Amino acid sequence: MIDTVILSVPRNKVSVPNNDWDLHAQTPVYKVYVKNPSNKDKESGLYFPCLTGYHRKSGKNEWAAMLKIEFSVPKLIYNNNLDELDDKQFSAVVDTLLDRLARLDVHIGRQDLESAEVRAIHYSKNIELTDGYSSQYVISELGKVNLNKRFDLTKTRFMNDGQSLYFYTKAHSFVVYDKIADLVKNSKRAIDKDQTAYQMSLFAPLKETREILRLEIRLSEKRKMNALFKKLGLPENPNFKEVFSTVKSKAVVNHYWDTMIEKNSLLLFSHSLTAKDLLKQILIACKKARGRTAVYLTGLLLLAREGNGLRELRATLAKRIGDRLWYRVCADLTETTKGLNKLRPREWYDQVKKVLESYQPYHLPCKE
């Protein structure tokens, strides 16, 4: 649904009784101030927005001031962004945000907050993969498509040993990453740079049982947001209340997926399997196989497919192994082939499409 949002509120709509803000930067034409949570606030375990005050010279003797509020919406409510929100929770989000602002000695009227200008918005979707598929496998498959041709995205990179795929420009970006693996990355390597202590604590109980693929569309500039909304038939210049919308989130996320992935989907399923592709499929089909066993089975299948197949392989090994061991090798080959035959090449893709079509909020299976 919605994740990070950046709001802009004019200074004359903000009450700040105590001007104990830190001066972050200064020139003759502007000043930048920041307000950070106190140690007591941090120890509370609550999530707080990032506040930045701008004071710019707008005329010869005139200055304009505004407050920038940046925060992850689900973290306000759940202290993590694996759980997703629905439209009915907007009132609770506003209540919580007003509370956090008040704790920072910043006061804004409810109506002014709901109608605040949106400078940037991140829409996202968490997708739990099943049937042995891993986020890293899906990311490696998506990396086979030349996505730069589908959008004005100028840079592409794999990050964190293939655990994330990042397509971006300054104005917008499309990120696909392994959400569970990202929970334990440090701030320099993590995709989510603003992890809460509670969110990081989720890694241990989830790492062995859940594979969560995260799609994230970051509209980092208002001009890009408006251009996209216009293209999708959505009103331009939305305020905070208007961007908090499942309909808008679904439209944006599906637009990026359909334009960048769906139109290239044939490329995902038409290539011949490499040795590494086969290894990945064996790890999915043979869920209990250890790494060494999976490598052995991959080599066995590749050797069985080459030349004259099993007959040539038997002749090559004749002086090294007896009949009993050979029959065991054949049994391994038969069992592995059965498992691979049950795999459907598009299964992981269909799982993603099903979630994007239903677009139901994702929630963690259990909470403390």
Model-derived segments and spans:
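Structured, helix-rich domain cores that form ligand/interaction pockets
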Residues: 1-317, 340-368
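Helix-turn-helix DNA-binding segment
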Residues: 324-326
